[in-house]
């Protein structure tokens, strides 16, 4: 039986684009307390009632609510219209780093992975609208866009944004980077955009803005993952630029393979260790 690992996603000519939340939907909801949002809605409805006849003033609110209810009913009874299932891969999958030739081979857990957490906290009543936050956020965004354009050069496997929920304010934003090796993260740390961001931060010393990072380094047999009925996430979003073995053309190969492959069914097996 062929126990070699096969990628679940077809190779692509360019890095795959995944569904992402808009900047507004990612940041804005947590900038206001629920009571504030309700009060804003009540104020807008009051204004409509003051300038329009009652039977017309209720139309916007009722329309939005009706669309939401009907959409939910449709997605529940017609699964093919369920937007929440977009890009979901059914079954058990795991992330394995492909080799330079684009194949995953037979040996799990091969290759090193460096996980780098880079985050920012905005400890201010104005949240992302606080002093210096616009400039710092723009610099973070510029770094993100630059590293995505140069994924192969900088050894980036995957990146994903997260928002912390340890506080009601949701004022912590975390960027999770997955690099191929230590050399890759060193290269990223010495990039001009990274240095310029630190220079700006150190010059202005905004006490209400916190910046943090964490680094985790793994070697062969030091990483393992399991995703069940998930869209590509975390290291499962990883991609490596390789040369096609048949015609030598460049392509991007993903990390996701089936976890039901005989050699990947257990925790130890996915680490490349004997049971």
Curated annotation (Swiss-Prot):
Record bears the keyword Cytoplasm: no
Function: Monooxygenase; part of the gene cluster that mediates the biosynthesis of fumagillin, a meroterpenoid that has numerous biological activities including irreversible inhibition of human type 2 methionine aminopeptidase (METAP2). Within the pathway, the monooxygenase af470 catalyzes the oxidative cleavage of prefumagillin to yield the final compound of the pathway, fumagillin. The pathway begins with the conversion of farnesyl pyrophosphate (FPP) to beta-trans-bergamotene by the membrane-bound beta-trans-bergamotene synthase af520.
Pathway(s) served: Secondary metabolite biosynthesis; terpenoid biosynthesis
Induction, per UniProt: Expression is controlled by the fumagillin biosynthesis cluster regulator fumR. Expression is also under the control of the developmental and secondary metabolism regulator veA.
Enzyme nomenclature, EC number: 1.13.1.-
Domain of life per record: Eukaryota
GO biological process: fumagillin biosynthetic process; terpenoid biosynthetic process
Protein name (Swiss-Prot/TrEMBL): Monooxygenase af470
GO molecular function, one term: monooxygenase activity
Gene: af470
InterPro entries for the chain: Monooxy_af470
Gene disruption phenotype: Completely abolishes the production of fumagillin but leads to the accumulation of the intermediate prefumagillin.
UniProt keyword annotations, A-Z: Monooxygenase, Oxidoreductase
Swiss-Prot/TrEMBL catalytic activity: prefumagillin + NADPH + 2 O2 = fumagillin + acetaldehyde + NADP(+) + H2O
Biotech / industrial applications: Fumagillin and its derivatives have been intensely studied for their potential use in the treatment of amebiasis, microsporidiosis and rheumatoid arthritis. They have also interesting antiangiogenic properties by the irreversible inhibition of human type 2 methionine aminopeptidase (METAP2).
